[in-house]
Amino acid sequence: MRELRPGLWHWNAPHPQWEPTEPWDQNVSSYAIDDGERLLLFDPLSVPPEIEQLAADRETAIVLTAPWHERDTQPLVERLGFPVFTPLPESAEVLIQKYGITAEQAGDGSPDLAWLVREKKGEARLYSPGDRLPFGADVFPGREPEDTVLWIESHRAVVAGDTLVDFGEGLMIPSEWLREAVTREQVVEGLRPLLELPVEHVLATHGGPFDRAALERALSPEEPKVDPASRAT
């Protein structure tokens, strides 16, 4: 674990469901932000003991960039009772519309966070693009409505799930993860307002922290030649 700036931590952990065929690295990133009163855990996996100790003295919440990034959310909620801020998982209707599957295949909708959202085994605080969350975060649209990008004003940080990633070549919008109906240009258009903000840190949960220059390249009109050297140190 390392502290990127006062009150902002980053750590890596191996994802238990990773397969060698995945384009992303086995080690994924999680983050914690502390403002002195509230502690936020972003897409948490293998939370370090020091962060758990700090959580005992703070109003702590888990923040998921996407429902499928729950990682260690369920055991943390079961053990410590943290509320969970998350986009709403895909309903059956959304799955049918997106992927052209049958109602039978769609079932009750996405199984992501079913224990939290459908079975009510925790406190879910659902959010959508365009929302401003109570801890001062603005929600921007990602490559899907359920895959968000967050602007944390207090720490001048952008947190991204699967919309801004690093597969070993620097920060980028992953074209292989875009549905046929979604273009890179559409994603860039939704995120371009971030460039008007005083962004200093880009916290990718696949790849680690980057700087503002990496964000500018990732959101350039033309798909950029990425630069791994832009990784934050």
Q: Where in this protein do the model-derived segments appear?
A:
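Short linear motifs in intrinsically disordered
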Residues: T21-W24, Q74, D138
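Active-site-proximal loop/helix segment associated with metal-binding centers of metalloenzymes
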Residues: H15-N27, I96-S128, P145-D147, F167-E176
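Active-site HxH/HxHxD metal-binding segment of metal-dependent hydrolases
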Residues: S46-D131
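C-terminal regulatory/interaction regions
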Residues: S230-T233
